[in-house]
C-alpha cells in the first residue's frame, strides 16, 4: 500500500527550505491562524509524548499503533479535521473514535489506490462525521473532470525539490501536484463549512491557486 502523507519531519524540512520559521510558541501560532488562516504546528514541539516515541518509531521502520494514535491525540483539541488513514477498514473505526472525542465535523479518507488522502487518480472513500452522524461518500476524480496522469508524478524527493514544487503550485502551475493539493484543500473547505458541495469547493481551490 502507498502512503503519500509526508511525516512531520518532511513537512518541516520543506518549510525550512523555504526559509519559513516553524519554532513558534502556541500564542504565536494562534495569532498566525487568526491573521492568515494558516498555522503549522510541528508535532514534537507541542506534543511531548510523540516527541519521545519518534526515534523509536523511526528505528522500527513499520506502521505501529502510533500511526493511528497521532491524529486522535492532537493537543490542539480541534473540532474539525480531515484525517487520512492507510487502510479502508480504519475509516469507520476512526469515525467512531473521533465521535467519542466530540469532533464536530470530520472527513476520514482513504483512496482506492492506497493513499491516505484524496487521490487524483482513483476513487477515494470518505466517512463523514458531522454532528454525531456518520455517512459515506465517494470522491471520483473523473466526475470532477480531473485528468491526472500517473501516481509517480506526485512522488516527492529531497526538501529543495519539494519546496520548488510547492512554489510552482502557488504560481498556478497545472499538474498532478496541484490537482492533489486542491482536492485535499477542498476537503478542508467542506469540514470548515465554507462549502457543502465538494465540486464547488474543488473549483474554488483551483481558482484561488490559479489567481496567484
Give each language-model segment a name.
Residues 13:
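N-terminal glycine-rich flavin-associated loop
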Residues 16-23, 28-212:
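Glycine-rich anion-binding loops and their surrounding alpha/beta cores
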Residues 1-6, 10:
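Single conserved hydrophobic/aromatic residue that forms the stacking wall/gate
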Amino acid at each position: 500500500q502507498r502512503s503519500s502523507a509526508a511525516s512531520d519531519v518532511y513537512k518541516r524540512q520543506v518549510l525550512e527550505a523555504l526559509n519559513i520559521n516553524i519554532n513558534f510558541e502556541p500564542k504565536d501560532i494562534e495569532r498566525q491562524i487568526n491573521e492568515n488562516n494558516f498555522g503549522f504546528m510541528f508535532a514534537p514541539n507541542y506534543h511531548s509524548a510523540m516527541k519521545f516515541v519518534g526515534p523509536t518509531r523511526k528505528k522500527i521502520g513499520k506502521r505501529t499503533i502510533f500511526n493511528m494514535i497521532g491524529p486522535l491525540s492532537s493537543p490542539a483539541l480541534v473540532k474539525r479535521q480531515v484525517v487520512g488513514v492507510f487502510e479502508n477498514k480504519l475509516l469507520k473505526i476512526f469515525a467512531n473514535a473521533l465521535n467519542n472525542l466530540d469532533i464536530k465535523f470530520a472527513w476520514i479518507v482513504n483512496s482506492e489506490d492506497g493513499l491516505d488522502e484524496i487521490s487524483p487518480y482513483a476513487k477515494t472513500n470518505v466517512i463523514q462525521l458531522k454532528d454525531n452522524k456518520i455517512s459515506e461518500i465517494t470522491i471520483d476524480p473523473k466526475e470532477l473532470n480531473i485528468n491526472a496522469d500517473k501516481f509517480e508524478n506526485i512522488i516527492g524527493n529531497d526538501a529543495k525539490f519539494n519546496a520548488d514544487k510547492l512554489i510552482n503550485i502557488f504560481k498556478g502551475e497545472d499538474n498532478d501536484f496541484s490537482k492533489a493539493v486542491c482536492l485535499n484543500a477542498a476537503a478542508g473547505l467542506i469540514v470548515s463549512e465554507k462549502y457543502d458541495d465538494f465540486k464547488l469547493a474543488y473549483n474554488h481551490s483551483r481558482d484561488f491557486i490559479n489567481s496567484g
